């Protein structure tokens, strides 16, 4: 990996990607490539932090003046009580994957999954206002994507999942916090055909293809 952009001095921004286990994480490779393309004096390193060790880890980061943390599983939810504030999507769906620690020690968490997904959709020129969307899957990012869809004008969202109870939990939260109509259905061929017949946007957020 080309690290010519990293000066390895006191101005170098150190970003710690934390989780357990960390053997297969691809985030440092992706972020360090981006840092290089942007000529940023920054580097991301993977750090294995065991479940239950987050309080000590956060204190160590403050002591060592480490400003940026990228939590992955199982810390996306567990880190929230240790932060001073989080953004709306993180608060509603209890998932943070970017943390900034200011010089005074205050910590701020945001969730980027929903925003990233919406940026990808909008960059393709898709118009969302007044449209109906169909989402297949109800994993950890489904809710935050749904929240962003509502902010960008989606009128109705149907979530299909093999375990309909999981989809219903997300639908209930979205119906409580947004004006978008959201319903959950079991993932059957009949329900898929019916929902697809009126949807203008399809989102595949199941684990299929992640391996």
List PLM regions with ranges.
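Receiver (REC) domain switch-region micro-motif
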Residues: 69, 133, 202-203
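Rossmann-like adenosine-cofactor binding region
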Residues: 180-211
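Residues at the starts of beta-strands that form the adenosine-phosphate
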Residues: 14, 43, 132, 155-156
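Glycine-rich adenosine-cofactor-binding loop
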Residues: 19, 108-114, 126-154, 161-166
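Short glycine-rich anion-binding loops that position phosphate/pyrophosphate groups of nucleotides
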Residues: 73-78, 141, 207-210
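Phosphate/diphosphate ligand-binding glycine-rich loop within oxidoreductases
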Residues: 2-124
């Amino acid at each position: 990996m080309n690290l010519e952009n990293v000066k390895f001095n006191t101005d170098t921004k150190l970003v710690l990607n934390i989780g357990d286990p960390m053997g297969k994480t691809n985030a440092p490779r992706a972020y360090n490539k981006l840092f290089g393309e942007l000529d940023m004096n920054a580097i991301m390193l993977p750090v294995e932090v065991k479940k239950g060790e987050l309080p000590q880890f956060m204190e160590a980061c403050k002591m060592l003046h480490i400003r940026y943390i990228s939590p992955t599983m199982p810390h996306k939810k567990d880190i929230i009580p240790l932060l001073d504030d989080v953004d709306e999507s993180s608060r509603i769906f209890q998932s943070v994957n970017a943390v900034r620690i200011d010089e005074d020690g205050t910590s701020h968490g945001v969730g980027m999954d929903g925003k990233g997904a919406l940026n990808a959709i909008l960059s393709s020129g898709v118009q969302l206002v007044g449209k109906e969307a169909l989402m297949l899957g109800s994993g950890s990012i489904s809710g935050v994507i749904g929240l962003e869809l509502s902010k960008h004008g989606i009128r109705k969202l149907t979530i299909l999942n093999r375990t309909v109870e999981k989809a219903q939990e997300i639908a209930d939260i979205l119906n409580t916090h947004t004006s978008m109509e959201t319903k959950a259905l079991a993932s059957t061929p009949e329900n898929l055909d019916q929902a697809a017949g009126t949807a203008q946007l399809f989102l595949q957020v199941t684990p299929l293809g992640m391996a």
